[in-house]
Amino acid sequence: MTAVQKIKVLCVDDSALIRSLMTEIINSQPDMTVCATAPDPLVARELIKQHNPDVLTLDVEMPRMDGLDFLEKLMRLRPMPVVMVSSLTERGSEITLRALELGAVDFVTKPRVGIRDGMLDYAEKLADKIRAASRARVRQAPQPQAVARAADSHPAAPMINNPLVSTEKLIIIGASTGGTEAIREVLTPLPPDAPAVLIAQHMPPGFTKSFAQRLNGLCRIAVKEAEHGERVLPGHAYIAPGHAHLLLARSGANYIAQLSDEPPVNRHRPSVDVLFRSAATHAGKNAIGVILTGMGRDGAAGLLEMKRAGAHTFAQDEASCIVFGMPREAIALGGADEIVPLAEMSRRVMARLATMGDRVQRV
């Protein structure tokens, strides 16, 4: 695609109102155009052949063939960048996470028809996601039951009732586009006694709880949505809720999680920079910072602050990123001690931890 060519977008949604609104938003952007719309996947299949779109926006739930079935077939036969369009429901969030496992690049929530408040922000986010998707590295759908096999090999870790109450070592992770699958790949190999993990992943409210529950069924550590004021424990991962910044703080000898409803930073709440900066302040050399795939620059400055505070820092390499935005910016600032392929990230992090020593206080 040359610089003068617009990004061609095919919108698939069973609602004529949503198709019209998405078309209006996309066509208002100078660098993209809706080449066609479809009310269901069967019509979309023919339009893909005719128009060869650069990006597909795909409704999660539709008649005749649902979005997941269509996505799975599409990513096996003709992989292309797909942005899922999902409702803000528990079922919608679970289906969307499955779509990301199947190879969708990203997702947006459905626009609220008839409500103009917030529409400019929505339009900006939609356009950003389409631009990122058009440049994304698309991967084929995994083999059937691959994720289920991973779950079987890593049974869910129980929440600890009488836990270790303090650890000096922490793993701090930030991600955006493509991050849900990257985070899964980093977390699943971690042993049950791994240090606590704090995660900021760009996600809207309503999705992070389902994301945490899904990971908890795949990992040997316990994974949960972070709660304000809770003690940060080894063998646990804490995911920032979609409506709040996650910060690390200290209470005596212990780390605690704090949530903040302060305004977005780098247009995001939760923000990776907010989490990384709090880790630089309160954990310093006892933390490891990891920046994964994602568009934009959120987390780049924060990773550099962690490094300057003595933390060892990792950035995902370009070849394994869905979108090489946030890691690229962090590397350009000099914030990354190591640049690592995603498949090696967990092993390299644990190897680094082994050189840092292990001092854990029991009660």
Curated annotation (Swiss-Prot):
Residues bearing the modification 4-aspartylphosphate: 59
Keyword Phosphoprotein: yes
Segments forming domain Response regulatory: 8-125
EC number: 3.1.1.61, 3.5.1.44
An example Gene Ontology CC term for this record: cytoplasm
Swiss-Prot/TrEMBL catalytic activity: [protein]-L-glutamate 5-O-methyl ester + H2O = L-glutamyl-[protein] + methanol + H(+); L-glutaminyl-[protein] + H2O = L-glutamyl-[protein] + NH4(+)
UniProt superkingdom: Bacteria
Presence of the UniProt keyword tRNA processing in the record: no
Enzyme class, first EC level, given as a word: hydrolase
SMART domains per UniProt: REC
UniProt entry keywords in alphabetical sequence: Chemotaxis, Cytoplasm, Hydrolase, Phosphoprotein
GO BP term (any one): chemotaxis
Subcellular location field: Cytoplasm
Pfam families, A to Z: CheB_methylest, Response_reg
InterPro entries named among the record's database cross-references: CheB-like (IPR008248), CheB_C (IPR035909), CheY-like_superfamily (IPR011006), Sig_transdc_resp-reg_Me-estase (IPR000673), Sig_transdc_resp-reg_receiver (IPR001789)
Notes on the domains: Contains a C-terminal catalytic domain, and an N-terminal region which modulates catalytic activity.
Name this polypeptide is given: Protein-glutamate methylesterase/protein-glutamine glutaminase 3
Organism listed in the record: Burkholderia lata (strain ATCC 17760 / DSM 23089 / LMG 22485 / NCIMB 9086 / R18194 / 383)
Gene that specifies this protein: cheB3
